[in-house]
Amino acid sequence: MSSVPVIPQARGLRHTGPVTVAVVSGPTAVGKGTVVGALLRSHPEIVVSRSVTTRPPRPTERDGIDYDFITPEQFDKLVDGEGLLEWATVHNSHRYGTPRGPVERAVADNRTVVLEIDLQGARQVRETYPQATQIFLAPPSWEELVHRLIGRGTETPEQQKQRLETAKVELANADEFDAVVVNDTVDHAVAHLVELLSL
């Protein structure tokens, strides 16, 4: 049996200054979508970048709201036309990406933009947009992360196993990020994000 990964502790930003683009990343089932959604509801002035993906929607997801669900061919056109700020193949299956245009328009309008993306995407944004503030959303414990993943009931046991292996890699690389927010409760995580983003 593999060992339980070390869970990063909460920490503040390593730098100061205004935050224009914020990356929120973290392992599967940590609650990225829930926390970012709650942040948007409490601060509608921010812009949350909507990702595109080639995976099918989960039962509770809506096309054009949670993600833009597109075909692999449509995704290829975006990649070829440099229409994505970042993209990655996640969990060795489906592709996800951040459309470039909406992010650039929001930045031009002096609005804070939040990108909810995985570790691979965060690394690409670090290269292409180094001024972005990178925030890692961590679970309170490994056991809680496993509980959340199994509890949502949207993946097969094999998919759960793959996602947990990916989560171990993501947790091991949390130190790459400018700050860590622990999602013990949504309210606490949102309050920490508000503080980090100076909203």
Curated annotation (Swiss-Prot):
Residues 19-198 form the Guanylate kinase-like domain. It comes from the Bacteria. Its EC number is 2.7.4.8. GO terms for molecular function: ATP binding; guanylate kinase activity. Gene3D superfamilies: Guanylate Kinase phosphate binding domain (3.30.63.10), P-loop containing nucleotide triphosphate hydrolases (3.40.50.300). The keyword Transmembrane helix does not apply. ATP binds at residues 26-33. It is found in: Cytoplasm. PROSITE patterns: GUANYLATE_KINASE_1, GUANYLATE_KINASE_2. InterPro entries: GK/Ca_channel_bsu, Guanylate_kin-like_dom, Guanylate_kinase, Guanylate_kinase_CS, P-loop_NTPase. SMART domains: GuKc (SM00072). Belongs to the guanylate kinase family. Essential for recycling GMP and indirectly, cGMP. NCBIfam families: guanyl_kin. This is Guanylate kinase.
